[in-house]
Amino acid sequence: MRFPPLLFFQDSEAVKRIANSVRGTKDDDAEIKDHSMRFIRNAISGDQQKEILNVDMLRYIAWVLVALNENIVTARTVIRERDAVEDALKNQQPEDIENFADDLKINMKYNRDLERFEIGVFDFVKYASRVTGSQYRLSNQSVIKGIVYCQKDVAIKILRESFVSNMFKVIDSIDQTTASPVLSDQTDSINELREFYKKSVYAKLTIGRGNTKAFPPCMKEIIRNLHEGINVPHMGRLAIASFLHKVGYTEDEIVEYFRNAPDFDESITRYQIKHLSGEISGVEYSPPKCETMRSNHLCFMDDDKLCHQDWMKHPLTYYEVKSRRLG
């Protein structure tokens, strides 16, 4: 398993050749095209089957994502392959892991005497901060003279996050005004993907018993960030989950709002929802009050007049008042 250099991904002629391929002529190119489009479509629908793509498919997919220009589709597609990469690395020998790390520009070596992987502290901190779990924190590793000594599972998480970072660098390096002409023969297929995305994702986000027009600005902003695949801090996730529960959303409906989170794990999400709803803990949690939202940089009142009322102390109060005003 290898990760090509940036120049490989920027080969527009190779991408155009694949885009223009027809079944029965260059079957390899046609298969790359068809398989890549299926992979993106399956990522949109939430298919979690793990599959390692070859480098030609990875390149073609990057160009299609740029032409499509839908953040959630990009995030879902990259995350789907990220999970496959992580799974594959678990079965790789140390030297193969070293080679993959080298492709990602990470200096990672396996110390056979200690049976640990060595990683520079800068790279470790950069990528470990994106992984959930205390076992991935620097404070729980052995660090000697700027070198982190970690177990294989921790090293794999570092490479997983580096893979994501490198994929987004690839995607950012491709100009959309270039991608669309290169993929002009695939315009209809790309538009079909866009329509499929809108139907499958937007439809789910409008499900629920709460009146979204009455949601306070803070909750709308958290939802927008989740919708766009932006990493929302723990307090923000707790706030929106407890808020949605309080205004009548079911567990399944709340889960859909979190599905685009970069580190989404359905089983963990469901457990946390059950906990805050009182099903597990026996205590039903309420969203944080406005003061707590402000202290955690989660208040986005801007010029909303209702937010600026002296008596406005809680997001649920906002929702109740706004709902009455909307009738």
UniProtKB/Swiss-Prot annotation:
Keyword 4Fe-4S: yes
Binding site for [4Fe-4S] cluster: C218, C290, C299, C307
Co-factor(s): [4Fe-4S] cluster
Protein origin, superkingdom: Archaea
InterPro entries: DNA_primase_lsu_euk/arc (IPR007238), DNA_primase_lsu_PriL (IPR023642)
Any one GO molecular-function label of the UniProt entry: 4 iron, 4 sulfur cluster binding
Gene Ontology biological-process annotations: DNA replication initiation; DNA replication, synthesis of primer
Keyword Iron-sulfur found: yes
Alphabetical UniProt keywords: 4Fe-4S, DNA replication, Iron, Iron-sulfur, Metal-binding, Primosome
Binding note for cofactor: Binds 1 [4Fe-4S] cluster.
GO cellular component terms, semicolon-separated: primosome complex
HAMAP family the UniProt entry points to: DNA_primase_lrg_arc
Protein family (similarity comment): Belongs to the eukaryotic-type primase large subunit family.
Subunit architecture: Heterodimer of a small subunit (PriS) and a large subunit (PriL).
Biological role: Regulatory subunit of DNA primase, an RNA polymerase that catalyzes the synthesis of short RNA molecules used as primers for DNA polymerase during DNA replication. Stabilizes and modulates the activity of the small subunit, increasing the rate of DNA synthesis, and conferring RNA synthesis capability. The DNA polymerase activity may enable DNA primase to also catalyze primer extension after primer synthesis. May also play a role in DNA repair.
UniProt-recorded name of the protein: DNA primase large subunit PriL
